[in-house]
Structures are given as C-alpha cells and as structure tokens.
Amino acid sequence: MEKSQKQVTRPSNSRREYSKEIPIDLLIEIFSRLSTGDIARCRCVSKIWSSVPRLRDFTELFLKISSARPRILFTFLHNGMVPSYDNEIHAPVRGFLCSKASVYNPSTGECAYPYLELLGLWDILPVDAENLAKKVCVPKVLLASEDFACRVSTLGTEEVCWRMIQCSLPHRPFRDEICIDGVLYYLANCKGKLGILWPVPSGDQSHEVTRSFVLRILEDANKLIWSRTVYTLSFNWKKLVNKSLYIVGMTSGGEIVLSTRHLNYPFYIVYYNPVNNTAAKNEIQFGNIANKKAENSRIYTFIDHVENVEHMD
C-alpha cells in the first residue's frame, strides 16, 4: 500500500498573504490622528500609504482637525539678520507662510518661489479666497504713477499664471496684513470682524505697550460704523515681565496676545483678557534652538497657526 502523503502548509513570511488591504477611508481616519512627523514616516510603508497625504479628502480633514487646536508659531531670522522689508515674514494663512518672493509650508517643509518679474515688486502675501489654499497675491506699486495693483496666482499648477486685479483705492501696502473671507486687510481679525489695535504711545517707543491701548472694531461695513474702546491697565507691563512687550494679535476667544521681540532670556508670551482686565504670562523655552541663534535675534510670533499637510506641487 502506498503511504498517504500529508499535506504540509509552510508558514508564510509575508503577512500580506493573510491580510486584506486597509480601506482607504480608514487610512484617512488613522492618518488624520497622527502628527506631521508620523505621517511622513508612514508614507514609507507602501504606495497606497504614500498616496494618502495627497488625497484632498485627507488634507481637508487634517486641516479641519488642526483648526480646532491652533498653535503658536515662532520664526527666526537666519543668522540674526537685521529685520527689513526684504525679509519680512507675514502671518500664516491656512498653514502657509509668505515672505519676499517665497511661500513656505512649515508642516511639510516645502518652499515655492513663484516667478514674477515686476518693477517695484513689494511682497508676496498669502490669500485664502473661497477656501482654496495656495493662493498668493503680489501687491505692486507702480512707481511712475503711484497706482496700486495686485496680481493673484495659484500654486501647484503646471504653469504659473498671474491675474491682474486693479485696486479701487490706491494705497501703499502695510506690513501687518490679514485675510478674512478672501478679503485682504492690513489690520486685525477681531472675532471675524475687522479691527484696529494699537498701543497708546509712550515716549519714543510708539509700538511698545505700556499702560493702555486702543481697540476699534468695524461693526457695520456698509455704514462704516466703528466702535472704540480704550483699555487702561491696572499694572505696568514692564513690571509684569521686566521687558518691553509688543502686540502680536487677538485670539479667536478675544484675548489680546503680546510678546517680546528678541531671543533673550526669558522669552514671554502674555495673554490679556480685556473683559476681566487680567493678564497671564507664559515663559517659552526654546532649548537647543536658542543656542544655534545669535543673541538678541529677532523673533516673529504668530498666533492661531494651523498645520496644513497639503503639498504645493
């Protein structure tokens, strides 16, 4: 009699033979709960995983979650350069930073240089029109006539195309610009309304906060009705932190944020509640970053920064 042969199943070294592919919807949900660093590492697992960060459903979900937990963003001038209009850094829009002739995404580490040859080029500003990221605006002052015009372009397209927009109110661009619902302003965002926030001058330090400052809010844009409130503090800022403080902006909750401007020890962020007339200070420790920067380096502080993993290409 022939001996019966037993069928032997060898254990496989590959788990893929026993596992099904993870549904893309589940991958999007998993990736949305990870940090940007973990997302970058997960891209090395497989081609499917590497494609998730480029899916629009994922980038919009990640941005939505990130918007619910805004952060403070600090930027430093390279090698302690002297601040000027050539290296001015503008407030981020949907996670994108803009400076002279460049757009940068801190979350992905990408940098774009949209080419535009213009005489009298002023700067590149971030624009968030119709919930579309990666739009940039270049205000240009025509030196001959002092007229003002803008050119708008969208990053990530095969060919960079600039669209000319004439401004009905000729003016020179201001530094502290913001974008609210696709409209470019040069003031402050006060709970979704246009606001002006400035300190009451004290001596030669016209931008330094001492004992009081003024907040004006555009309550009715059609009738140009502005509210005006003067906040007089019951204490001196220098006694609170023993340093000069400058206005950074206003949070979505209505708190006014102030900070020092240079990399000195200690570095403070102060949150002022105008309703209760109270302030809370937080010391920021930069660790090894501070050791690599020149003493007294200029620091740009931005509030309500959100992480955006959308790619520029």
Swiss-Prot record:
Where located? Cytoplasmic granule
**Stated name of the protein:** E3 ubiquitin-protein ligase SGIP1
Which GO molecular function entries does the Swiss-Prot or TrEMBL record give?
A: ubiquitin protein ligase activity
According to UniProt, the reaction catalysed is: S-ubiquitinyl-[E2 ubiquitin-conjugating enzyme]-L-cysteine + [acceptor protein]-L-lysine = [E2 ubiquitin-conjugating enzyme]-L-cysteine + N(6)-ubiquitinyl-[acceptor protein]-L-lysine
Domain F-box intervals: 16-65
Name the job this protein performs: E3 ubiquitin-protein ligase which triggers the ubiquitination and subsequent degradation of SGS3 in response to heat. Involved in the mechanisms necessary for quick response to heat and subsequent heritable transgenerational memory of heat acclimation (global warming) such as early flowering and attenuated immunity; this process includes epigenetic regulation as well as post-transcriptional gene silencing (PTGS).
State the pathway, as annotated in the record.
Protein degradation; proteasomal ubiquitin-dependent pathway; Protein modification; protein ubiquitination
In a knockout, what does one observe? Answer: Impaired heat-induced decrease of SGS3 levels and delayed SGS3 degradation associated with abolished heat-dependent early flowering and trans-acting siRNA (tasiRNA siR255 and siR1511) accumulation. Lost heritable transgenerational thermomemory.
Q: Classify the main location.
A: cytoplasm
Q: What is its EC number?
A: 2.3.2.27
Q: Which GO terms describe its biological process?
A: heat acclimation; proteasome-mediated ubiquitin-dependent protein catabolic process; protein ubiquitination; regulation of photoperiodism, flowering; regulation of siRNA processing; response to heat
- From what organism does this protein derive? Arabidopsis thaliana
> What turns on expression?
Up-regulated in heat-stressed plants and unstressed progeny in a HSFA2-dependent manner.
Specify whether Nucleus is a keyword of the entry.
no
Q: What broad taxonomic lineage does this protein's source fall under?
A: Eukaryota, Viridiplantae, Streptophyta, Embryophyta, Tracheophyta
- Which Gene Ontology terms of cellular component type are present? cytoplasmic stress granule
Give the UniProt keywords, A-Z. Answer: Stress response, Transferase, Ubl conjugation pathway
Q: What InterPro entries does this protein's entry cite?
A: F-box-assoc_dom_typ3, F-box-assoc_interact_dom, F-box-like_dom_sf, F-box_dom
Record note on quaternary structure? Interacts with SGS3 in cytoplasmic granules.
Q: Which domain of life is it from?
A: Eukaryota
